[in-house]
Amino acid sequence: MIELAPIYFGAMGFQAQAKQCYLLQLRSIVNEPTPGEMEDALDSMSKDLTGAFEDTISRIKSLPKNRAQLGMDVLMWLCHARRVMSTEELSDALAFRKGRGSKLSKYRPSLSMILECCHGLVIPSADTGYIELAHYSIQEYLQSHWPDLFPSFEQQLASTGLGYLMLEEFRRGPEAIETSYQLIKKRLRDFPFASYAAHFWNHHITNVQAAEEIGPILIDSVYDAGAIASSVQIGRFERGFRSIYVDPRECLSRTPMHNAS
C-alpha cells in the first residue's frame, strides 16, 4: 500500500482546503485496483477545491441512473432549501412522486443511501438530526454552478412543495384540535416534509408561477379548500398561534381569493 497522505499533503500543504479536497478524493483513489493505478490517480488529482468538486460530481453522475438522480437531487435541495432540513424531511421530499394521490413511504431513501450517493459532499448531524453540505465551500460551488447542475431547481422545488400539499392526506382538510394537538402532531410525524412545504411553498413559486408544470398545480390548489386549510393549520400551529386560529373551521374560512393572494 502506498502512503497517500504524505504524498498528497506534501504537495499541497496542510491547509484546511487541501484537507477538504483530500477527503473528497481519497475514496476514489483507494478503490483503484493496483498500487500503480493508485499512484496514477494521485498524480492526476485536482489541486484545488473546484477541481475536487467537479471530480466528485462527475462520480455521482456516473452512478446508476436512479442513484445519480438521487445524489443530484439531494445536492439541489441542500443548496437551495430555504432553511436547514432534517434527514426525515429531506427523505420525505425525495420520496414525493408527482401524479400520485397518496403518500408512499416505501420511496423514502435511507440516510445510508443518501450518503452513499453523495460521495462525501453531505453529512448528517447526530445531535440535531439535520443533514447538511459537508463544507461551506460546497454550497458556494453549487450556487455558482447552478445553471449547469440544477437548471430547473426553482420549478422542481415549487412543484414538489405544492404538489405534496395536494396529497390526499391534506386534501381531506385540517385536523380536529384538542388540548394537546395530538392529531396535528401525528400528521407531522407521518408526513415529515409537510412542515417545510406549508411554510415555504409560496416562496418557491414566486419566480416560476407561469411555468408550464407549475400553473395547473397552482390553479388546482387555489380551489382546494382542504389542502390549503391543512397547510394554513400546520403553519399556524408551528408558529404558536392561539387555538382559535388553529381550529379547522377558522382555517377553512379562507376563500379562493384569499388563497390566490
Provide a role label for each language-model segment.
Residues 1-145, 152-180, 189-200, 252:
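P-loop NTPase nucleotide-binding module
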Residues 155-261:
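Hydrophobic repeat-domain scaffold segments
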